[in-house]
Design a protein with these regions (language model features):
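N-terminal presequence-like segments and the immediate start of the first folded domain
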Residues: 1-117, 121-134, 140-193
Length: 193
């Protein structure tokens, strides 16, 4: 049996239709089985344990916030660790403009350059550069067709930046969140402050 609920709000203004199996799993997570969970319901931090300092990374001059078009993630997350270590975890970033629109549909090369532009802006918003990047994960819609171009542009960009060594990297063929996006890159930067 399914139960329907309307969740008001800008991101969740839709009907929720919970199946019996969902209800079982929701209960196991401490959520109400048949109704939307209120924010902050689950508190799982053990007594006496500190929370790692986290902050969303934004750069509205370069690209908009994902939540503006209903996505449930942030563009990046800054995590401050003990000992003055900061990690910047940049979410999958693509050729998206400041208003959330896809830029350069059908042009793989231009989309890749814009993706690097967006990532550079996110890094700069936290005082970081590509020299702080230690790992990238690169999602390419058609890896057989576009990987040669991808590798050529990446090599040119990283050489122009003087990166030595290059970051660790993995290339994966993937269906990206929008059909007109051809490439998306996640990145991890580590800074010592």
């Amino acid at each position: 049996m399914k139960t329907n609920f309307l969740i008001p709000g800008s991101q969740l203004d839709r009907m929720i239709n919970y199946s019996d199996a969902e209800k079982i799993e929701r209960r196991a997570l401490g959520l109400p089985a048949c109704e939307p969970a209120p924010g902050g319901l689950i508190k799982q931090l053990p007594k006496g344990r500190k929370v790692v300092s986290k902050k969303a990374i934004t750069e509205p001059k370069v690209l908009n916030e994902a939540a503006e078009y209903g996505a449930a993630f942030v563009r990046g997350l800054r995590v401050d660790l003990p000992g003055g270590i900061t990690q910047l975890l940049l979410s999958g970033t693509a050729s998206v403009g400041p208003n959330g629109e896809t830029l350069y549909p059908g042009d793989f090369r231009a989309q890749l350059w814009r993706t690097y532009h967006n990532l550079t802006g996110l890094l700069a918003s936290e005082g970081a550069t590509w020299h702080d990047i230690v790992r990238t994960t690169c999602y390419i819609r058609d890896i057989e067709r576009d990987y040669g171009e991808f590798n050529s542009i990446r090599n040119e960009f990283f050489h122009a930046l003087g990166l030595d060594p290059f970051p660790a990297s993995t290339g994966i063929q993937a269906r990206i969140c929008r059909s007109d996006l051809l490439v998306e890159i996640e990145a991890l930067a580590i800074l010592v402050r």
